[in-house]
Amino acid sequence: MSKKLHIKTWGCQMNEYDSSKMADLLGEYQGYTLTEEAEEADILLLNTCSIREKAQEKVFHQLGRWKTLKDKNPDLIIGVGGCVASQEGKAIKDRAHCVDIIFGPQTLHRLPDMIEQVRRGEKAVIDVSFPEIEKFDRLPEPRAEGPTAFVSIMEGCSKYCSFCVVPYTRGEEVSRPSDDIILEIAQLAEQGVREVNLLGQNVNAYRGATHDGGICTFAELLRYVAAIDGIDRIRFTTSHPIEFTQDIIDVYEDTPELVSFLHLPVQSGSDRILTAMKRGHMAIEYKSIIRRLRKARPDIQISSDFIIGFPGETKEDFADTMKLIEDVAFDHSFSFIYSARPGTPAADLPDDVDMEEKKQRLAILQDRITQQAMRYSRHMMGTVQRILVEGPSVKNPMELRGRTENNRVVNFEGLPKHIGSFVDVEIVDVYTNSLRGKFIRGEDEMDLRRNLRPSDILAKHKQDDDLGVTQFKP
């Protein structure tokens, strides 16, 4: 009877990536297979996020539900990872006695060892340290699950925005060596991946070591990835405006594999609030980045993050945010009502904006961005869009689902053979959350460029010594 693993994930794409690596790790080294049903699992892992309001209480509520399963099965192992575990490890241990393992984002690679410690009778094994880049050296080779893949290129953040817990839960910025990233993407491309999304809390701050002792910038890494045959689309998230340098903007001018869509969080359009947030830039500097981006890539579309009701935010401050939204013409946003995060400098500020006022401002902001997004979508009517076919349509499994460069879902009638490849479709209808397309041509009728085959990169790295032990070298 196979051993079962259940993982519940909350939060950002980095957490989704980490959870997939936990599954790979425990599958590779201990033979666990994933299950959607917590009731049939031998191990339950909760990968937590501390960004949202009442994150800690949400964790304890979930653990309370899992405790009933452990009462029935004392051999069940329960682990808590992610940012809440990193921040509140001792509190979790003291309050939730059903928890066996507590680990941080940088120590998930030690899960097999921690599980063995529990099997030997140890109680509440905790490791929320920050061993920098060690975890990437201990993870199994990547496994593709469809034509798109996330690849983590760096961890942590050193910006210390006044509202944010990330530097305290994931540590400061640490970049992976560039050769390791290129090798991982080449391995994914060999398995059929066509689009990669490069991940980091502050991804454009990437400065990775090269094999010859140099430093690879984020702009250089983008060009290296674009040269890998089979990788025809590159996305990245999340960026910080103060690291969005001209060399990155230049990549948009000469690298078509980099999509015409960018998520660049700004949080507020008020210079006064941006200063209180310790963002390190003003609204005019943000608009300067967007202006230069649109000069390099005229059709690029921008999404952002907004925090509504930050301490001290006046109606005039909110009006500045709405003015920025109009000036930039954002296509999408993730917008939230401010709530204090324990341990951050902003938590000491008086939360003096009325909750009803916050809700009204949030509704106004979201309504405006929805209008702008629909305007962009309507402009796509009648155009031919190249989409990457990801699988069957969610609502109608007899149809296919793909995604445009500007991150819109398109449903269309097509043959299953197109899954995992690019097709051109004409946009024939527009909905709030998706588009309707008509199939025009398949990939066999396109002229997709070929530069550097993944097998060339793998061969370059792979070397067998006299004993037949495989090593990977630059």
From Swiss-Prot:
Residues 3-120 form the MTTase N-terminal domain. Residues 378-441 form the TRAM domain. Keywords: 4Fe-4S, Cytoplasm, Iron, Iron-sulfur, Metal-binding, S-adenosyl-L-methionine, Transferase, tRNA processing. SMART domains: Elp3. It catalyses: N(6)-dimethylallyladenosine(37) in tRNA + (sulfur carrier)-SH + AH2 + 2 S-adenosyl-L-methionine = 2-methylsulfanyl-N(6)-dimethylallyladenosine(37) in tRNA + (sulfur carrier)-H + 5'-deoxyadenosine + L-methionine + A + S-adenosyl-L-homocysteine + 2 H(+). Catalyzes the methylthiolation of N6-(dimethylallyl)adenosine (i(6)A), leading to the formation of 2-methylthio-N6-(dimethylallyl)adenosine (ms(2)i(6)A) at position 37 in tRNAs that read codons beginning with uridine. This is tRNA-2-methylthio-N(6)-dimethylallyladenosine synthase.
